[in-house]
Amino acid sequence: MFHHVSVMLKETIDYLNIKEDGVYVDCTLGGAGHALYLLNQLGDEGRLIAIDQDTTAIENAKEVLKEHLHKVTFVHNNFRKITEILNDLNIEKVDGIYYDLGVSSPQLDVPERGFSYHHDAKLDMRMDQTQSLSAFEVVNEWEFEKLVRIFHRYGEEKFSKQIARRIEQNREQKPIETTLELVDVIKEGIPAKARRKGGHPAKRIFQAIRIAVNDELSAFEDSLEQAIDAVKMDGRISVITFHSLEDRLCKQMFQEYEKGPDVPRGLPVIPEAYTPKLKRVNRKPIIATDEDLEENNRARSAKLRVAEILK
């Protein structure tokens, strides 16, 4: 059974200005905490499209949301397919969309899923258990240069080359099969002095591999682009991110759509095509409260950004 404390639960949903008869999309159903809070505000005419690529999360959510099942459509898919999902459901536009990005606590806490550097398990890290690519393939089969690139880009790890070299040397002897085997190899690639600073030495590499396995950043970019088109005028999008790469991507995309295209000089009236698509509701991200942090330490890195659609 999932046990998951949702981060910034009220803020994420309240900023959507929920309408009783509205149609909303939860792109990251997870433990269903946000979904339950939203559904409690929806009337019988309202509807929630709940997306997750993890079938375990969906099965658990059906239990959590059992009193509201008549208002929920569950979709096992990647959120990068929002347009396709809504088309299949004959929904043209929705009133709001929200994301709670990152790994849900249950995925981290179930050792067999291979996300955690604290528990020994087979290298896996697949959010969608039906996909073939896992952390094992990334660690044991990807070329040195490709490993360096993902460690640097997705983990912002300054010892990317040294760690990738250690992985290459170790896997030539025998495959690196478990999370703790990988942790040991990562430690070999980081100077002792640096290992003692900045949290767990494997944290950034595990993040990078997880992002690569699940293609998280490009999936989010695709999804957010589609979400901006899928929301009605005056509807909103809430996004909770957990690391700087996602937050930067979200911030930049909101800024681009808020700015709109460059307007040709000398036009007496600005055509609608040149007006902004959205406005940012909060210029600076909302961060977790002390209360949030007491309930869930993972909220420490969470940032919430909200945008309102203008046309």
Curated annotation (Swiss-Prot):
GO terms under biological process: rRNA base methylation
Top-level class of the enzyme under EC nomenclature: transferase
Matches recorded under InterPro entries: RsmH, SAM-dep_MeTrfase_MraW_recog, SAM-dependent_MTases_sf
Binding-site residues, S-adenosyl-L-methionine: A32, G33, H34, D52, F79, D100, Q107
Residues annotated as transmembrane: none
Protein's UniProt name: Ribosomal RNA small subunit methyltransferase H
Major localization listed first in the record, in broad terms: cytoplasm
Cited function: Specifically methylates the N4 position of cytidine in position 1402 (C1402) of 16S rRNA.
Enzyme Commission code: 2.1.1.199
Subcellular location(s) of the protein: Cytoplasm
Keywords: Cytoplasm, Methyltransferase, rRNA processing, S-adenosyl-L-methionine, Transferase
NCBIfam families: 16S rRNA (cytosine(1402)-N(4))-methyltransferase RsmH
A GO term for molecular function: rRNA (cytosine-N4-)-methyltransferase activity
Chemical reaction(s) catalysed: cytidine(1402) in 16S rRNA + S-adenosyl-L-methionine = N(4)-methylcytidine(1402) in 16S rRNA + S-adenosyl-L-homocysteine + H(+)
A GO CC annotation given for this chain: cytoplasm
Pfam family, any one: Methyltransf_5
Superkingdom per UniProt: Bacteria
Family note: Belongs to the methyltransferase superfamily. RsmH family.
SUPFAM superfamilies for the chain: Putative methyltransferase TM0872, insert domain, S-adenosyl-L-methionine-dependent methyltransferases
Keyword rRNA processing: yes
